[in-house]
Amino acid sequence: MKKHILMATTALAISFGAPVAAQDDFAGFSEGILGMLSSQGATISFDARNVGADGSVELVGFNLTAPDDEVIIVADWVKGVPSAVTPGQVTFTLSPSAVVTINDPDSGQHIINISNDGLVVTLDGITSGQSAPVLNFSVMANSLGVTSGNPNDPVIKALDIGFTNLSQTVSYTQASKLLVGATGLASLMMNYDLDLPEEGKLASDGQVADLQLAFQVIADDDERTMLEYLSGATTGFFEFSAGAASATAKIYSPEARIAYSGTSTGTTIALRAENGYVNLVEEVGNTQYSFSEFNIDGLPLPPFDVSLDQIRINFSTPTVNHGSFEEANAEIAMRNIVISESIYAMFDPGQAITRSPVNAVVNLSANVMPNVNWANPDASFESGNPADIGEVQDITINEVLITAGGAEVTADGSATIDNSMGFPFPTGKVTLNVAGVQGLVNGLVAIGLIPQEQAGMAMGMMMAFARPGAGADEFVSDIEFSPQGVTANGVPLPM
């Protein structure tokens, strides 16, 4: 079936998108395309062919049938209008409804209904202008829908996909191979139920609001392009965001059976390299999932829920020497993860371990100065001198928070870095605060996860390098770094 879908989309693209002559006679050009398709075994018919004074061509009652009726495309009308301003540019429109029929000898007949309101597709380089400095492509539609038209389809049990306020633009600069694009959607609705012979059953009913995508890249596979991003010679970025989303889905395959429903308040992914700086941000807002079935490779879990407030990854750094130390940041945060009792009960039915939310947060910043020679990066990385890669002036712990099973670990502190010794050496202090760890260790012993002897050794080691805190089950340790060595509350640590 995938082959036939590809054939259908290819046929549509070829019928109005393949240049055969460098000329702006769109009427003659379209005749040549139809003739070429006919010579390859396709059957093309239409009730009327209207050629306008503006050079436009409208095919009314359009029907394109591939050899052996494998793919049939039917539309009330298809129209192309050449630009009066940009040579070779053509704008295409389609009747509000069209039907694509795929006759697959293996999976049967699949009927796909395509509906649209205000669909407009504009492409450069159609009848001429293929060598223009910049080629552009755009798609606009108030709405665009794809549904199944065969209630007895053995594969597509249900299909209803809808795009609202679609806007997409792409430009390609031929000399530099610069590819720039932007896509926007007010909403995306997806309802499908697919019974695939090899993959299994895939079903989902969901929607997402306010989808945005933008990118700028050099469209080649030359490894030097990456060096251009890092050196600041070229700007590249990928930015994606989505608003509130919800879905109910099933995945039934030979390896897994998963059924769930979930919601999310939003997602952001951004990667940018510009002017000698690199920044990566990934963030997922409040998310909740409920799994009614979860079985992978014959290992089932009971129905369970999982939720979290935030997942965030943030990394930013200069990549070239701008003449002074500059701030770099690294953050990984998973906040307030809550898992339902049904999962805990699998290994701790007696509730020996506290059911507190899980947090894992590390947020660091540093002042750094990169020294990599991006014209010959191997020389910098293989010199054996860390200073040829870069220098670190200081490091600050903005936040460390780890919680699980009633225990909590926090840390704060900072250190300055001496780069004169042939390797970076820190001088400073980090204060660790550990609370609830005795209760967690006792719980792990109670459920048999760790032996009592090992638990005692671990607690004894911690007490040797920590002092009692304000609470009954709380310990504090000051880790100090100096040229004389590393100590914990004044006790030298083995090096």
Outline where the language-model segments fall.
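Gram-negative bacterial Sec-dependent N-terminal signal peptides
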Residues: 1-22
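Glycine-rich, small/hydroxylated-residue low-complexity segments
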Residues: 23-495
